[in-house]
A protein has these predicted regions:
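A hydrolase-biased, glycine/serine/histidine/acidic-enriched motif that marks catalytic-domain neighborhoods
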Residues: 1-265
Length: 265
C-alpha cells in the first residue's frame, strides 16, 4: 500500500493504523515535495501525482499495488491511481479514508456547508439561552462571539513549521482547482461513520469515476479528524485487512525511493 497523507503531508498520520495491520502488509507513506529543506511544494494535483508516481515506479514498476489517501490527500491519491492505471500499472484498488470529494473544498460549497452548520448551531444556542439565567445570557453571548471572531494567524518562525504551512496552503489550493477524470481501478471508500454518506463532503462521488466501488463505515460519532487516531485505528485497520485479503500479495525486498516513507509501527 502506498498512501498519500492529508493536506499537511504528515505521513505519520497513518502510524496508529499501521500498528494494527499484519506484519507482512507493506505500507509506505508518500511524503510530498516541499517538506524537506531546499524543496518546493508542487502547485497542481496532477504534478503531485506525477511526483509520487515516479517514486513508486522506481520502487515497484508495474505492481500489483494499492493506493490510499486520507482527507484532502484522497484527491491526490485518486489522481495518482488514475495516472498509474493509465500507464499500465496494476493498481488493484484505491482506498480513500474520510476523503471529501474535491469540489467540496471550493468556496461556494464550503460557505454553504458552514451556513447549514451555523443554522443548526443557532437552534442549539437558542435552546441553551432559554435555559440560562437572564443574568448570565450576556456573558454566554459574549463568549460565543469571541469564539466566532477570526484570529490573526501567528507568524511562524520555525522553518520546519513554515515549510509545512506552505505545503498545506499549496495542497488545498491545488485540490480546489482539480477536476477528476476517469480512473480505471476499484475504489474502497472508508467513511468515518455511516452518516458521512450524506455530509457536506459528498465522499461517494468519487465512485462515479471508478470502475467499481465498495463502501465501509466506522462507528457513529467517529469523524474524519479522529478516524486514524488510536481510538479508531483498529476498526479501520480491520477494514483494510478485509479488503486486502482479496488481492494478490505483493513481493518485497526492493530498495525504497526517497519520497516513500514507511510509517512507523
Amino acid at each position: 500500500i502506498f498512501a498519500v497523507a492529508g493536506h499537511n503531508g504528515d505521513v505519520f498520520a497513518y502510524r496508529a493504523l499501521v500498528q494494527h495491520l499484519a506484519p507482512d502488509q507493506p505500507f509506505f507513506g508518500l511524503q510530498p515535495a516541499g517538506l524537506e529543506e531546499g524543496s518546493v511544494p508542487l502547485t497542481s494535483v496532477e504534478d503531485m501525482a506525477r511526483y509520487f508516481a515516479a517514486q513508486i515506479r522506481a520502487f515497484r514498476p508495474t505492481g500489483p499495488m494499492s493506493i490510499a489517501g486520507y482527507c484532502a490527500g484522497g484527491t491526490v491519491a485518486f489522481e495518482l491511481a488514475r495516472q498509474l492505471t493509465a500507464a499500465g500499472a496494476d493498481v488493484t484498488n484505491l482506498i480513500l479514508f474520510g476523503a471529501p470529494y474535491c469540489t467540496s473544498y471550493r468556496p461556494l460549497r464550503v460557505r454553504a456547508a458552514q451556513a447549514r452548520y451555523l443554522a443548526g448551531r443557532s437552534v442549539t444556542h437558542a435552546r441553551t439561552l432559554l435555559q440560562v439565567p437572564a443574568s448570565e445570557r450576556r456573558r454566554y453571548l459574549a463568549a460565543r462571539l469571541r469564539r466566532l471572531t477570526p484570529r490573526r494567524a501567528a507568524q511562524i518562525s520555525d522553518p520546519v513549521l513554515a515549510r509545512r504551512q506552505r505545503v498545506e496552503e499549496t495542497t488545498m489550493a491545488a485540490v480546489r482547482e482539480y477536476t477528476p477524470g476517469p480512473c480505471g481501478c476499484h475504489l474502497d471508500v472508508m467513511l468515518p461513520c455511516s452518516s458521512w454518506r450524506r455530509s457536506w463532503a459528498r465522499p461517494l462521488r468519487w465512485g462515479r469515476s471508478t470502475v467499481s466501488t465498495a463502501v465501509f463505515a466506522g462507528p457513529e460519532g467517529c469523524t474524519g479528524d479522529v478516524m486514524l487516531l488510536p481510538g479508531h485505528a483498529p476498526t479501520f485497520a480491520a477494514l483494510v485487512t478485509e479488503v486486502q485479503r482479496r488481492l494478490p500479495r505483493p513481493a518485497t525486498g526492493a530498495a525504497r525511493p526517497s519520497a516513500v516513507r514507511r510509517a512507523a509501527r
